[in-house]
């Protein structure tokens, strides 16, 4: 699935968190119905490696089926399912049944899991006249969840609420997940879907979204509308209320481990991210922090007087100095002198966000990379072409004339290294 180093890096990061701050996993009813084997396999794997996710589920498709069988027509208003007193018995039965089915499937997989179908969400009527027995959450009680976590058992929570007087209310599962996340402040929020992520205009999964640099442009795209636009807006609102390190992952149940434990992931990773600083002179940057970023990323030392002797064309640096691109000029084409990303920012999409901003302003570009550089797979995908030398791979973008490419290759061969072991 990934290198042992990658998996160990993420496992160490997750294991250092308080148990209830690891992850909230939102599971839709369609996943429970269609993909429960992959779901339970992935959740069981997390427990095997010492991590306990908090699972919250809906049961929309199952409820639709039961209501149809009972001759009751589904009615929604403003996205909320109208829940009349005569349908509440069916709602309760469906949620309890779905919850127990997931518990039993987890137990068959050797996992420990706890059924929680009440006692978490205190609620009041959203608007009884309009929606019937639909609740708006007024408080979240963590005691049942914490008891489950202390027993190293996966809490499996149904999105049902109760009024202070004990009336059961139907709670929208997305709303319940948002409120639970707001109280828990988890490191990861995971939405499991059949699509495996947010899709772009070509129907391909968007790997990562850095909201600080991409949200305004993304939300204006013609292919972002309806449910997808609403989902992105909801995720932004969710992350705005969470610590900077929190993130949302949207993936398939079968790909959950890959999304969590590899830099590349498998799905869409959404983070608030960091603003990107653009500089054209070294004096506009915090050079000690930039030096630390470069040396930590490459695990090598910059040559003495690097900043004094290197003519800067442009630098793109994340505001917390966790990722940077440095451009200089060798000849007439911008030269990518450094692309550095700290270990703890790997897999966040932060490096890609900085890279994308640089590329928007830099149609022509060339750079070199050592043969054993782990970023080479990324460079192959991002470049228009490459050439192998004894010690370097030379990559380029936007160069179409052989003579120009030849000059860039020659520059790379002659340019002395600026990092030493």
Swiss-Prot record:
Pathway: Amino-acid biosynthesis; L-arginine biosynthesis; N(2)-acetyl-L-ornithine from L-glutamate: step 2/4
EC number from the UniProt entry: 2.7.2.8
GO MF entry, a single one: ATP binding
Organism superkingdom: Bacteria
SUPFAM superfamilies: Acyl-CoA N-acyltransferases (Nat), Carbamate kinase-like
GO biological process: L-arginine biosynthetic process
Pfam families cross-referenced by the UniProt entry: AA_kinase (PF00696), NAT (PF04768)
Chemical reaction(s) catalysed: N-acetyl-L-glutamate + ATP = N-acetyl-L-glutamyl 5-phosphate + ADP
Primary residence: cytoplasm
First-tier enzyme category under EC: transferase
Domain N-acetyltransferase as annotated: residue spans: 274-420
Keywords: Amino-acid biosynthesis, Arginine biosynthesis, ATP-binding, Cytoplasm, Kinase, Nucleotide-binding, Transferase
Residues annotated for substrate binding in this entry: 59-60, 81, 170
Name of the protein: Acetylglutamate kinase
Organism this protein belongs to: Xylella fastidiosa (strain 9a5c)
Lineage of producing organism: Bacteria, Pseudomonadati, Pseudomonadota, Gammaproteobacteria, Lysobacterales
Chain's gene name: argB
């Amino acid at each position: 699935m990934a290198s042992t180093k990658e998996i160990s890096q993420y496992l160490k990061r997750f294991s250092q968190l308080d148990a209830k701050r690891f992850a909230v996993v939102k599971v839709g009813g369609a996943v429970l119905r269609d993909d429960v084997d992959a779901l339970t396999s992935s959740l069981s794997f997390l427990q095997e490696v010492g991590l306990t996710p908090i699972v919250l589920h809906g049961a929309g498709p199952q409820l639709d089926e039961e209501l149809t069988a009972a001759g009751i027509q589904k009615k929604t208003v403003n996205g909320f399912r109208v829940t009349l007193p005569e349908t509440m018995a069916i709602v309760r039965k469906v949620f309890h049944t779905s919850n127990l089915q997931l518990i039993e499937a987890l137990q068959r997989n050797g996992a420990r899991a706890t059924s929680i179908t009440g006692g978490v969400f205190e609620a009041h009527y959203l608007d009884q006249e309009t929606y019937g027995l639909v609740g708006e959450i007024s408080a979240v009680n963590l005691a049942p969840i914490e008891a489950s976590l202390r027993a190293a058992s996966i809490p499996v929570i149904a999105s049902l609420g109760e009024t202070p007087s004990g009336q059961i209310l139907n709670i929208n599962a997305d709303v319940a997940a948002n409120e639970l996340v707001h109280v828990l402040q988890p490191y990861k929020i995971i939405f499991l879907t059949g699509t495996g992520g947010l899709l772009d205009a070509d129907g391909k999964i968007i790997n990562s979204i850095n909201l600080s640099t991409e949200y305004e442009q993304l939300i204006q795209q013609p292919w972002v509308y309806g449910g997808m636009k609403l989902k992105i807006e909801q995720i932004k609102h969710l992350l705005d209320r969470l610590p900077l390190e929190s993130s949302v992952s949207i993936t398939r149940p079968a790909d959950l481990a890959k999304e969590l434990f590899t830099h590349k992931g498998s799905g869409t990773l959404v983070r608030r991210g960091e603003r990107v600083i653009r500089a054209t002179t070294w004096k506009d940057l915090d050079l000690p922090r930039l030096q630390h970023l470069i040396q930590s990323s490459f695990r090598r030392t910059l040559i003495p007087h690097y900043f004094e002797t290197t003519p800067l064309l442009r630098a793109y640096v994340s505001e917390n100095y966790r990722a940077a691109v440095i451009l200089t000029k060798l000849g007439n084409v911008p030269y990518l002198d450094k692309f550095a990303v700290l270990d703890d920012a790997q897999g966040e999409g932060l490096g890609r966000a900085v890279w994308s901003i640089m590329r928007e302003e830099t149609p022509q570009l060339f750079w070199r990379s050592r043969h054993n550089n782990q970023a080479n797979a990324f460079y192959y995908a991002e470049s228009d072409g490459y050439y192998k030398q004894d010690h370097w791979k030379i990559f380029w973008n936007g160069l179409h004339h052989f003579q120009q490419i030849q000059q860039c290759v020659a520059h790379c061969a002659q340019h002395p290294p600026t990092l030493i072991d």
